[in-house]
C-alpha cells in the first residue's frame, strides 16, 4: 500500500533551441515531451528567437523561457546553474554548427552554452543537428562531433532530405518523434521514465 506522501516526480527535461530554420520543430518536441508527463523548461538562443517566439514554448511547457544569460527568477541562483541542477536530460534541437562548436570547445557565451558547461556529470545531453549538408560534413564540424561523442554526448541525425537552402542531402533535423523517443530512452536508462 502506498502512502499519499510517496510521489514520483516527473522526468525533467531542458529543451535548448538554437538559430536554425528547424527551430519551429522544437515546439512539437516540447509538446511530445509534455504529453509523456515530462516537466519541460526551454532555453532559447538569441538567434533562435529570430525564427520562432517564446510564446508557444511558454504555453506548452507552462514554464518561463530562458532567453538570456541574465534572465533571473525570484531566487538568487543564476538560471543556467539552477537549470543544470534541475535537468535529468538536456536536448538541443535543433543544434547549429555554431552551438555544437561552442560546446565542443567549452565556450559559454549564452544561457544555453553556459548550461551545457554547468551540467552535472550524470545528466544526459542529446544533440539533434540541423544545418546545410556542407556545414555538417566540414572537417571542423566532424571533429567537434567526434569530441562531443568522446565525452558521452549523444547525437541523433541529421537526416537526409531537401534542406531549406534548396540543397538535398544530410543536414535536416531528425523527425521530432525520433528525437523525443531518444529523450525518453535516455530517461529510462536513468530509471526516470
Summary of predicted features, one role per range:
Residues 1-127, 133-193:
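A cross-family phosphate/adenosyl-ligand binding-site feature
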